[in-house]
């Protein structure tokens, strides 16, 4: 430590505030891996073992209450830089292998033994799960699938009461008929988001939901019904605004008690509209 207690760290490059428009939404990992060490303080570069440098850290700060950011979204922003900055804080400037090699090899690692908060299924882009029929109350092989994904199924509609679920997991619910207006939609982290669409009794349709870390898109019979991307919300008589995020890690664990007929369920670990 310095005698003047002027221990320092630089946060701008390693500080996340999700969708705020200031600081980072996602860290610039290629730059951090190639150029950054805890010895970089603003434009100054200290000796790697300078006594005033106690170590390194990075942070995510959720400044905006009600912006729709989920626990899964926070984890999605943290896990990858946790790997990158762990290397940099351990090795400093001497990383040993190029970033491209590091980025490829780390994809083979799990988050931790028995941990899959990113809800990754499979190692390459492919169809990862399918069922010919989804029976009410049945369970699946996976609790959920994370970004990026496509879930599709055929449905023959029947009368459904409000609050009828298609699937649920410990983290989210996807509704055939949401509890408020009876529309298709989803709930997670205390937020309810609904599409301008409902399956009417007797209607036959092919439903497709695509999700990534920015949006959730509903297609019916191949046509986009709604792309729930980042939405601008205004408050304080329009003087202030905030970005609102409508993402979903799609629940698969248990089917709801629906009356409709659901067939040809297919789950892909990529967005099929963005090959």
Residue ranges and their predicted role:
Residues 185-206:
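Short, aromatic/His-centered strand-loop micro-motif at the edge of beta-sheets
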Residues 11-28:
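Polar, glycine-rich mid-to-C-terminal structural blocks
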Residues 37-104:
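Substrate-binding cleft of secreted/luminal carbohydrate-active enzymes
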Residues 225-263:
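Flexible glycan-contacting loops in extracellular carbohydrate-active proteins
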Residues 151-153, 203-220:
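Short tryptophan-centered beta-strand motifs in secreted/extracellular beta-sheet-rich domains
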Residues 1-9:
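Single conserved hydrophobic/aromatic residue that forms the stacking wall/gate
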Residues 68, 80-147, 157-158:
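Carbohydrate-binding surfaces of carbohydrate-active enzymes
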Residues 126-186, 262, 267-274:
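Extracellular glycan-recognition modules
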């Amino acid at each position: 430590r310095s005698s003047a207690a002027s221990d320092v760290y630089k946060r701008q490059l390693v500080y996340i505030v999700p969708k705020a428009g200031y600081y980072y939404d996602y860290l610039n990992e290629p730059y951090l891996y190639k150029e950054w060490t805890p010895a970089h303080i603003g434009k100054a570069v200290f000796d790697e073992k300078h006594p005033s440098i106690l170590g390194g850290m990075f942070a995510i700060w959720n400044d905006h209450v009600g912006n729709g950011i989920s626990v899964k979204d926070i984890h999605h922003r943290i896990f990858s830089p946790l790997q990158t900055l762990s290397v940099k804080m351990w090795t400093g400037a001497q990383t040993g292998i190029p970033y491209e090699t590091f980025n490829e090899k780390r994809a083979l690692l799990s988050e931790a033994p028995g941990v899959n908060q990113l809800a990754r299924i499979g190692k390459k882009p492919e169809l990862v799960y399918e069922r010919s029929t989804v029976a009410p109350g049945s369970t699946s092989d996976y609790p959920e699938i994370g970004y990026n994904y496509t879930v599709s199924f055929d449905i023959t509609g029947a009368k459904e009461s409000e609050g009828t679920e298609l699937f649920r997991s410990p983290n989210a619910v996807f509704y055939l008929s949401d509890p408020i207006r009876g529309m298709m939609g989803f709930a997670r982290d205390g937020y309810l988001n609904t599409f301008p669409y409902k399956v009417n009794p007797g209607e036959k349709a092919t439903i497709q939901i695509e999700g990534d870390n920015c949006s959730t898109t509903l297609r019916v019979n191949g046509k986009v019904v709604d792309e729930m991307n980042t939405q601008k919300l205004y408050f304080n008589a329009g003087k202030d605004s905030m970005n609102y995020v409508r993402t979903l890690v799609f629940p698969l664990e248990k089917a709801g008690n629906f009356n409709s007929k659901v067939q040809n369920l297919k789950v892909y670990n990529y967005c099929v509209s963005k090959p």
